[in-house]
């Protein structure tokens, strides 16, 4: 996928995530899939925290030389940040806001900016281009995860 298509997909992510949870009951939001995965509620909060983290990663890549990009423990975030208990509205808003501000930065990147790199603490070399490839799919992947969990819950 070229950059323009990736950026368009990136921009569409919040709409798809919101559509996946629209009209769900608390029971559906809290359904724990048989495969041991997260409930739809937990997925929304994870997506928000990941998007907030991704926004900082983009900014570090662009503003710092050889930026250090930190990984984080997703399971500890889920547990310590009370993913199972919190309402999802603010997290959906955080996803949208993070995406809009980051997309506006990406709209202004030069060719040199696209080549900026850093090092991810878990996966090694990490570039602005890689950032967009990863996060263009992120909301869509989690919307599909939510849809699968809800389908299972309704069986």
Question: Locations of the language-model features?
Answer:
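Alpha-helical bundle segments that constitute or directly flank the non-heme di-iron/ferroxidase center
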Residues: 1-26, 49-56, 60, 134-137
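Acidic/His metal-coordination segments adjacent to aromatic residues that form catalytic metal sites
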Residues: 2, 40, 77-91, 122-130
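Short helix-to-loop capping/linker segments positioned immediately adjacent to catalytic or ligand/cofactor-binding
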Residues: 27-32, 87-91
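Short, contiguous alpha-helical
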Residues: 30-74, 103, 111, 115-155
